[in-house]
Amino acid sequence: MIERGKFRSLTLINWNGFFARTFDLDELVTTLSGGNGAGKSTTMAAFVTALIPDLTLLHFRNTTEAGATSGSRDKGLHGKLKAGVCYSVLDVVNSRHQRVLVGVRLQQVAGRDRKVDIKPFAIQGLPSAILPTQLLTETLNDRQARVLSLNELKDKIDTMEGVQLKQFNSITDYHSLMFDLGVVARRLRSASDRSKYYRLIEASLYGGISSAITRSLRDYLLPENGGVRKAFQDMEAALRENRMTLEAIRVTQSDRDLFKHLISEATNYVAADYMRHANERRIHLDQALELRRELFSSRKQLAAEQYKHVHMARELSEHAGAEGDLETDYQAASDHLNLVQTALRQQEKIERYEADLEELQIRLEEQSEVVAEAAEQQEENEARAEAAELEVDELKSQLADYQQALDVQQTRAIQYQQALTALERARELCHLPDLSADSADEWLDTYQAKEQEATERLLSLEQKMSVAQTAHSQFEQAYQLVASINGPVSRAEAWDVARELLRDASQQRHLAEQVQPLRMRLSELEQRLREQQDAERLLAEFCKRQGKNYDPEDLEALNDELEARIAALSDSVSQAGEQRMTLRQELEQIQSRVKTLTSHAPAWLAAQNSLNQISEQSGETFESGQQVTEYLQQLLEREREAIVERDEVGARKRAVDEEIERLSQPGGAEDARLNALAERFGGVLLSEIYDDVSFDDAPYFSALYGPSRHAIVVPDLSRVRDLLDGLEDCPEDLYLIEGDPQSFDDSVFSVEELEKAVVVKVAERQWRYSRFPSVPLFGRAARESRIESLHAEREALSERYATLSFDVQKTQRLHQAFSRFVGQHLAVAFEADPEAEIRKLNTRRSEIERAISQHENDNQQQRVQFEQAKEGVAQLNRLLPRLSLLADDSLADRVEEIQERLAEAQDAARFLSQHGKALAKLEPVASVLQSDPEQFDQLKQDYEQARQTQRDARQQAFALSEVVQRRAHFSYSDSAQMLNGNTDLNEKLRQRLEQAEAERTRAREALRTHAAKLSQYHQVLASLKSSFDTKKELLGDLQRELQDIGVRADAGAEERARQRRDELHTRLSNNRSRRNQLEKQLTLCEAEMDNLTRSLKRLERNYHEMREQVVSAKAGWCAVMRMVKDNGVERRLHRRELAYHSGDDLRSMSDKALGALRLAVADNEHLRDVLRLSEDPKRPERKIQFFVAVYQHLRERIRQDIIRTDDPVEAIEQMEIELGRLTEELTSREQKLAISSRSVANIIRKTIQREQNRIRMLNQGLQSVSFGQVNSVRLNVNVRESHATLLEVLAEQHEQHQDLFNSNRLTFSEALAKLWQRLNPQIDMGQRTAQTIGEELLDYRNYLEMEVEVNRGSDGWLRAESGALSTGEAIGTGMSILVMVVQSWEDESSRLRGKDISPCRLLFLDEAARLDARSIATLFELCERLQMQLIIAAPENISPEKGTTYKLVRKVFQNHEHVHVVGLRGFAAPPADALPGPAEVS
């Protein structure tokens, strides 16, 4: 028999009136006796505080402040403590004889709220010799002690070996320890449990029938059927979860396409944009690098162009300067040529004019003679004409005068006067004052003779003049020739000068004959000199081009060197061309190969993805296609093995399910037919009677009853006999035992217990030996243990079955994946990585491009060197033939010498050219210069004088002839004389007039004809003179101009000048062409530099923009990559095969996916908003956020009980594996989990029946309890009528309400609530839900009504109410009920606590003076029978006969208050020494 634990003592430290007081507690009743204020309630409060240290519950009423608020309420504890550290400690010895101190440290908290700080603790392993006061205080001297703080107490205990102090931060942990050690009867897990326990203590403390307990007796007495309720709840939860899972499967099946579509489109949408950005980033990086290369190349090219520009500008400036000089030289040469040509033309003109002048001179002389003759003849004709004219005029005037005289007298006078006038004129001309008309005739003859004489003399002089003029003209001609050759010279020196000139002329002719040879020699030397100058210029240019000065003698060696260099460079260039061709061919091959690999890469990447997938799924690494096919065969074998193992596990799981179902039968009946037979026979299953047997006792009873442990216990076997006839629906062996089901015991067998076995004497000659089963099934605890283990096994089997099913499905899908891989990708999967080869080829291509670029640069340099060498050789080819010229230093001197000789010869030739004809003319006539014909002037003067004399004589003769002709008029002295002779005179006059007019006409005609001739002669002469003078003047001008020109106009001058001009023109043209070429090149260079500068600026701008774009894109890309890696979606988004698509294709792919996504997420506001935000092209990370949001959304929609992954993509793969299997499994599970209404009714009925039996057992313990008029106390348990109807309908009429229980939309609890509403429509359900009502209806306690009844006097059994009982009766009745509650708690908790622990039982009773001695004795008897401790507080007049009594007296000494305690043993007890005296410790 297990000994019950006991409270040994209560220790109060530093309480009000108790400094260090230990109350030893009696094993039964401890009485605290004393007057009011003695400290009884303080002691009990300390005990209760140590038991339940919960300030939310502690409430000691006698010190409660009336009307105080809850915030400042004292709770009655603050005033019971003194300042400082206080302790309340219980010393307990449990059933294992373990000593444990449990208690609390209390301390007042300063403040107006009068709060108390409580700290629970426990001390284990303390030796029994150490008292609590010794442990909690420190003795200072004989009269003084100090209370230790909790830390000091801990330090003190740490020094004790084997002693352990535990402090608790929660009351639950504190009570858990107390329950495990058997200090409290019930595990107080929650505040509700603590509240129940405190209410029980409170009801015990203050006595009477507590309404708080009687109203909730079901909660105190009826244990919560947690197992059944939990089973229902678990079953419902399993069904609900099963249905939800099935619904989730159906939704998931419907969502699978949505998953696929959403994931596919989201992946396409985001991955395409992700890869497009990755491609663009790579392209931008490549572009940035390319721009940087172009930038550096452009800078280098610009520097080269600038250098080239400087070089060409310098060369252009040199050519421009040279061009100015050449233009000057060319212009000078052109001018010289023009001058030479002009001089030649002038010379030709001079010669032509000289010839013309000579011819004109001859013609002029001849014409002068003709004019002189014509002039003379004209003078004669004029004289005759004049005479004839005078005569005619005279005759006409005479005739007119005569005619007039005929008419008037005056006419004769006029004629007479005219005659006189003519006479006077004749006198004047002839100087004859005596001339008269009569002598006029004579004088006429005289003067005609004079005229004849003068004419003859004139002719003689003219002949002399002609001869003299000829001699004079020869002298003058010779003199003019000398003067023209030598210049002005005196006539006397003319002969000497002429002779000197003729002598020099021969020397001049000799020199002139040397002009042409000298000119040819000079032309040759000048040509050589020009060639020498050209050679020097070429040499200077060559040295300038070569950048080094060379001597002429070094040019041949340099030529050989340059030709060798040209040959080497030519070979190098040809080899470079071949090498370049080879490199370009290799580059083309690489590009072709890269193109082929690029087109092949997506298929290879798809194959690699598929290979990686099957490798991840299989956990294997495949190196060849043969390994794949071999592994495919292994998969087939593994699939067959997994299917066999799965079927075996499924069979075992079904067997376990059947066993669980069998063991879960109500009452422990393994056969459901036994329950029906028990109801039919009115008995109870033996297993149901022993349903509460402990797990440790189950093997014994199972072996004790053996095969009859499934027997039916009936009150009377005879009544059952008739029912056995015709019984068919029953087990093969049916055991019936007669006995009272309410008080059945195992006395029906004679049994002997052995080691792990029993021997049962069934009869005198029949024994049965039964060993304790290794897995007992007798009793609810054993069955529950077995069911629990079976459930664990079933869970393991289910998990194993699910695993195997999953493995089978996985293997099948893996087999399908391998089959697809073999069919689609095996041919390319194990080929070499095209991307790696592409990278190698790209590296090689870069190397080749660099090599080509370097080769081009080298080749360009070689070409430049080749062109330079070639140009040098060309220049040398022009220079080498002129090396002799370069070495000829005397050429210039020879040229100068020849030029001087040529100048002399040219001067001689020019002299001869100018004066050769004059010298030739002078040579034959030079001798005439010896004598000067001076008389020519006198002869000429005489000739002029004779001519004037002849002219005067002719005039005189004419005048005399006119007088002679008018001689008749002298006779007109009077008019009468004239009138008389008018007829004859008139006739004469007329005849004479006619003759005179005829003569005049002839004279006029002769004069006119001769005048015309003379005029013509004069015109010819004037023309000749004018022409002669003009040409002579022109000749002088031309000679002066020729002298002014200062150029030797010889025959070769023009050719030399033209050659010089043409040479300079060629050089100027070459210089201009070179300058133009340089200007064009310079313009092109400047344009190229401008283009390069603009290109450089553009490249710099583009490079900086691209670099900024790359840098900014890098930050955004880093954020994107960080987001991708943080969310683990890189594998989904980085689809390498998309890297081979163009940006437009990827953008089109993303746009198409975006359109599909808009439709797909149209009903999801969150995804729709995130998708809308992700459309911003400037925020690519939002697409990642959308992708993550899609994944998160899909993860949230993944049922983890169906699919064991968080990855939606893997979830889709697992869906295919799991959905079909789970659908089938969950459908069968739902059928198994379906709750039968009849089984629920049976379970509730059996539970109610069991609890009614337990309450009846408790009532047996209360039958002998009596208080005053109360003779007995009992608990009455009845089933409520409405609930009984519900049970009956569930058991018998459930088929009428299958619409509720077969509905998939309702849980069993909800269906039960709906049925309750159908059966009790009059009951208002309020605001409670059907689920809540159904859960209440599954709790059997709600079916029962409990009330306390007392058998009082003559009234019989009455309901226990405070108003119907006296105070003492009420206290006793309430104490009885509390004892029942404590005992019920112990029974309920027996399976939770160790089997070797029997908990302490202790109750309180304050103000026990209201009980009489009989009632107190009853309490003592109850305590003794129930092994219960009781603490009673009573006034001093109570002196119980049993137990321990403490007399408490509160005293005040010197303003110091303390309680004087005296302890006494009960009088009826065996003699014993008195307990220690009063404690005076202060």
UniProtKB/Swiss-Prot annotation:
GO terms for biological process: cell division; chromosome condensation; chromosome segregation; DNA replication. It comes from the Bacteria. GO terms for cellular component: cytoplasm; nucleoid. Keywords: ATP-binding, Cell cycle, Cell division, Chromosome partition, Coiled coil, Cytoplasm, DNA condensation, DNA-binding, Nucleotide-binding. The keyword Zinc-finger does not apply. It is found in: Cytoplasm, Nucleoid. Signal peptide: none annotated. Residues 1051-1066 have a biased composition (Basic and acidic residues). Belongs to the SMC family. MukB subfamily. Plays a central role in chromosome condensation, segregation and cell cycle progression. Functions as a homodimer, which is essential for chromosome partition. Involved in negative DNA supercoiling in vivo, and by this means organize and compact chromosomes. May achieve or facilitate chromosome segregation by condensation DNA from both sides of a centrally located replisome during cell division. This is Chromosome partition protein MukB. It comes from Cronobacter sakazakii (strain ATCC BAA-894).
